[in-house]
């Protein structure tokens, strides 16, 4: 049952996780972690896509071709592929606070180094290293998943990630203004764009410092180091079984694939939209940046509403409802991406369709992380890292194939046609959602396996020796909370049995295992 302790102005579940997301509060540890996670993620987006915001200026100063600008964009999203996988393991070991601070501090020098680039090679290299900071996404989702109850974790994850993703739009608005302000102050244009990168670089250091000073890893109010000293966090066991649980679960790979064509599509648009509007419609940089920013800024509500819709649909329809709404929403996003490429002769139509496209695309991103926490309790960080990396892989492949164009293996299309085929690809690959099946909840088209309960699914991640040591207890508490994913029909049956009986069943199963 939910409890309200004196020091928390909101209800907690049996794991000490918040059952609400009061975004106006900064209460330790739940809401402070929430705000620190999305702010760090926001800044990683600002810095990663700041070069795309100034692409026309940088392109002219460094004498880059459009193909080279596109390939540099590919390098930016490639940087985070391995970084996200590594960060998933890292946060499972040391906690999200150190993970977030490390991501920011280790990539801040690369942001400053953008002022030193001289040609395509150095430009692409620096974008690669700045892009490593996008692994902040894993810290963001892991931290929120640690702090919020399973019934609202989709909402919490989606709001935090959505507000973080806004950085991809905000930079298109902010960076041209910073550049123009420096230039108006008397600095030559070829120097002004370089000076502009000292702003996000400095903010990286500030946000990392605040994370170390104010962040707390765990709902108990303690960090991972203290919990390990007490023995509370030995429940993770050895690292290899954790990695095996995450990478050995086929659901992780399907979600990584489909996330590559929601978040991956979003990253691709963030990389190309300003240059597209600048070239296609003859706009100046400030106007192209402001209009391009709209796509990313829709994250202020769109990704959050995706998580909310996923959580709401799960109440009557359970996990099967989450899967259905993800497939429908992401398919609609792909369809509107196709339409956007077809209306390239009209700026007004392009912007209107872009807004609709962005809403569905970003809602699908949020819906993915309404499902991800249930794939594996023991390897939540690894699964988050793999799914997050899938977003970057999708972006790298999509941009390399459709938007970078002059190599023999690349397809040389007009930019409008590139949007069309990106949408077709997204619609086709989203079909993979239909193959996700949980034995205790079912899939889009099939029901659960008779007699299988949540405890069975999460207990299989632990060996008999680990169960004997009691290392599985956290997973059993999570299994009990996750019974809410059955939907109304099974939930009424659960209510009839009662929480106590469910806890007894879990204890018996843990003993006999």
From Swiss-Prot:
Coiled coil: none annotated. It is a multi-pass membrane protein. This is Nitrate transporter 2.2. Belongs to the major facilitator superfamily. Nitrate/nitrite porter (TC 2.A.1.8) family. GO terms for molecular function: nitrate transmembrane transporter activity; nitrite transmembrane transporter activity. InterPro entries: MFS, MFS_trans_sf, NO3_transporter, NO3_transporter_NarK/NarU-like. Keywords: Cell membrane, Membrane, Nitrate assimilation, Transmembrane, Transmembrane helix, Transport. Involved in nitrate transport, but does not seem to be able to mediate transport by its own. Acts as a dual component transporter with NAR2 (system 2). Involved in a high affinity transport specific for nitrate. GO terms for biological process: nitrate assimilation; nitrate transmembrane transport. It is found in: Cell membrane. GO terms for cellular component: plasma membrane; transporter complex. CDD domains: MFS_NRT2_like. Induction: Up-regulated after a long nitrate induction period. The gene is NRT2.2. The chain crosses the membrane at residues 38-58, 74-94, 98-118, 128-148, 158-178, 196-216, 247-265, 281-301, 323-343, 351-371, 383-403, 419-439. The keyword Membrane applies.
């Amino acid at each position: 049952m939910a409890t309200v302790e004196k020091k928390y102005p909101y209800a907690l579940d049996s794991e000490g996780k918040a059952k609400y997301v009061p975004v106006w509060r900064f209460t330790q540890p739940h809401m402070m972690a929430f705000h620190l996670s999305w702010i760090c993620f926001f800044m990683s987006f600002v810095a990663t896509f700041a070069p795309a915001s100034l692409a026309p200026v940088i392109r002219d100063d460094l004498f880059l071709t459009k193909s080279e600008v596109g390939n540099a964009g590919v390098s930016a999203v490639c940087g985070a592929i391995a970084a996200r996988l590594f960060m998933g393991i890292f946060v499972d070991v040391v906690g999200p606070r150190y993970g977030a601070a490390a991501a920011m501090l280790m990539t801040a020098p690369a942001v400053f180094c953008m002022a030193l680039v001289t040609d395509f090679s150095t430009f692409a290299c620096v974008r690669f290293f700045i892009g490593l900071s996008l692994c902040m996404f894993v810290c963001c989702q892991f931290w929120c998943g640690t702090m919020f109850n399973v019934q609202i974790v989709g909402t919490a994850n989606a709001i935090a990630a959505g507000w973080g993703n806004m950085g991809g739009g905000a930079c298109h608005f902010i960076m041209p203004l910073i550049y123009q302000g420096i230039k108006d102050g008397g600095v030559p244009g070829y120097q002004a764009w370089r000076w502009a990168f000292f702003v996000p670089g400095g903010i990286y250091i500030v946000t990392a410092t605040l994370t170390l000073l104010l962040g707390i890893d765990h709902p108990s109010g303690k960090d991972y180091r203290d919990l390990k000293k007490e023995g509370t966090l030995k429940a993770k066991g050895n690292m290899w079984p954790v990695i095996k649980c995450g990478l050995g679960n086929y659901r992780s790979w399907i979600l990584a694939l489909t996330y590559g064509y929601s978040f991956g599509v979003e990253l691709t648009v963030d990389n190309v939209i300003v240059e597209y509007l600048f070239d296609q419609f003859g706009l100046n940089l400030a106007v192209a940046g402001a209009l391009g920013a709209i796509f990313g800024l829709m994250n202020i509500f769109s990704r959050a509403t995706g998580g909310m819709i996923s959580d709401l649909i799960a109440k009557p329809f359970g996990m099967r409802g989450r899967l259905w709404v993800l497939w429908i929403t992401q398919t609609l996003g792909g369809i509107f991406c196709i339409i956007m490429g077809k209306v390239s002769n009209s700026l007004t139509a392009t912007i209107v369709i872009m807004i609709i496209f962005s809403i569905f695309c970003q809602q699908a991103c949020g819906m993915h992380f309404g499902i991800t926490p249930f794939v594996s309790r023991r390897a939540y960080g690894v699964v988050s890292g793999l799914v997050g990396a899938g977003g970057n892989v999708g972006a790298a492949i999509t941009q390399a194939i459709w938007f970078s164009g002059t190599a023999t293996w690349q397809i040389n299309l007009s930019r409008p046609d590139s949007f069309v085929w990106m949408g077709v690809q997204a619609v086709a690959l989203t079909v993979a959602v239909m193959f996700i099946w949980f034995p205790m909840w079912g899939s889009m088209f099939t029901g659960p396996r008779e007699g299988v309960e949540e405890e069975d699914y999460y207990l299989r991640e632990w060996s008999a020796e680990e169960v004997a040591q009691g290392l599985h207890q956290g997973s059993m508490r999570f299994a009990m909370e996750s019974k809410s994913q059955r939907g109304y029909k099974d939930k009424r049956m659960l209510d009839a049995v009662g929480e106590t009986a469910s806890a007894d069943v879990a204890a018996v199963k843990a003993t006999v295992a």
